[in-house]
UniProtKB/Swiss-Prot annotation:
Disulfide bonds: none annotated. InterPro entries: DMSO2_SphG, Luciferase-like_dom, Luciferase-like_sf, SsuD_RutA_monooxygenase. Involved in the dimethyl sulfide degradation pathway. Catalyzes the oxidation of dimethylsulfone (DMSO2) to yield methanesulfinate, which is oxidized spontaneously to methanesulfonate in the presence of dioxygen and FMNH(2). Induction: Transcriptionally activated by SfnR. Belongs to the SsuD family. It comes from Pseudomonas putida (Arthrobacter siderocapsulatus). It comes from the Bacteria. The keyword ATP-binding does not apply. This is FMNH(2)-dependent dimethylsulfone monooxygenase. Pfam families: Bac_luciferase (PF00296). It catalyses: dimethyl sulfone + FMNH2 + O2 = methanesulfinate + FMN + formaldehyde + H2O + 2 H(+). CDD domains: Alkanesulfonate_monoxygenase (cd01094). One of its GO terms (molecular function) is alkanesulfonate monooxygenase activity.
């Protein structure tokens, strides 16, 4: 029997929210707001929260709390929620990341996870004095990073000799509580990203897309993973606008786009499209994104979780039917909308899942 679809939310630990727009956002990046949000999300049925990693300002993100630190703070404020801390190879070494995350796992009863971000913002790397590798080299480094994490977390006297990282007879103690290790997430949509996920990652995040577009990615990565004898779960980005009527929801979307900051949207679009264009296939997560799509950082409008609770629940169950395991959601007004989602959307999703299971059992 298939598992219920899981839900995660983007932690707003970076100022400016998740849309590049001057629309009012009743969301704050400060720690008090985020602690309360984590508690609301936990009560509302969310299993995961994903913290963001940024080092420099840009596209409205003038202030940024560091991801591992805020992840620990949110875990301390909750009891069941898992928090996924975003980490960049380069600024982090696998030795440091393994030690930090193992310690947090011990302190929180096994509730930390990691999102290994290969990097998309060239200016940020230059600003902090980190080398900017070519596209596929970034993913090669990330794969070594993940292999090193797994080795450190699961072996004593770990040795590893890669092109980017080396370990000689290293033993980490204490190791994480989670067995075999904390869950490892990654994102991307290039061939290099999918290939890496099919070999080493537990979870693969993809940008928002149509059902058909998501299915093509799911089928491709699952086939690659099967060929490698590996299992990987799929998470999809979605910007959720749930309102009592579809007209209200569509009006909110229209206002977000109408109040978009053109300079910031175009600057962000140029940065991410250049990063993707450096891949051998000349594409990436945002290759086909329009101006309207780019107003939301991760193409979240494309997933179309916009409408009434019933409409959104039906679309979520349709995504589950094509192999999606998790919805990574963003909101305009996080606290109130996460609570609304938990009260009005999530119960409908569970009802529809139960109906589908019953129908399969009868058939």
């Amino acid at each position: 029997m298939s598992q219920p679809i899981k839900f995660a939310y983007w932690v707003p630990n970076v100022s400016g929210g998740l849309v590049v727009s001057k629309i009012e956002q009743r969301t704050s990046w400060d720690i008090d707001y985020n602690r309360k949000l984590a508690q609301i999300a936990e009560r509302s049925g969310f299993e995961y929260a994903l913290s963001q990693i940024r080092f420099t300002a840009g596209y409205g993100a003038d202030n940024q709390h560091e991801s591992v630190t805020i992840s620990h703070a949110l875990l301390a404020a909750t009891e069941k929620l898992k928090v996924i801390a975003a980490i960049l190879p380069g600024p982090w070494s696998p030795a440091l990341a393994a030690k930090q995350l193992a310690t947090i796992d011990q302190f929180t009863g096994g509730r930390i996870a990691v999102n290994v971000v290969s990097g998309w913002f060239k200016g940020e790397f230059r600003a902090i004095g980190e080398p900017w590798l070519e596209h596929d080299e970034r993913y090669r480094r990330s794969e070594e990073f993940i292999r090193a994490l797994k080795g450190i977390w699961t072996q004593d006297n770990f040795s590893f000799h890669g092109d980017f990282y080396r370990f000689n007879d290293y033993t980490l103690k204490p190791k994480p509580l989670q067995r075999p290790h904390p869950e490892i997430f990654q994102g991307g949509s290039s061939r290099a990203a999918r290939d890496m996920a099919s070999r080493v990652s537990d979870w693969y995040f993809t940008n928002g897309n149509s059902v058909e577009g998501i299915k093509a990615q799911v089928d491709d990565i699952r086939a690659k993973a099967a060929a490698n004898g590996h299992a990987v779960k799929i998470g999809v980005n979605a910007f959720v606008i749930a309102r009592d009527t579809e007209e209200e929801a569509r009006a909110v979307l229209a206002e977000i786009i109408a109040k978009a900051d053109p300079e910031a949207v175009n600057g962000f679009g140029s940065e991410v499209k250049n990063a993707g264009a450096a891949s051998p296939e000349g594409e990436g997560n945002w290759a086909k994104s329009t101006f309207e799509d780019l107003v939301q950082y991760n193409d979240g409008f494309k997933t179309n979780l916009i409408g009434t609770p019933r409409q959104i629940a039906e679309r979520i169950v349709a995504l589950k039917a094509i192999g999606v395991d998790l919805i990574l959601s963003g909101f305009l007004h996080f606290q109130e909308e996460v609570e609304y989602f938990g009260r009005h959307v999530l119960p409908l999703v569970r009802e529809l899942e139960q109906e589908r299971r019953a129908a399969v059992a009868v058939a």
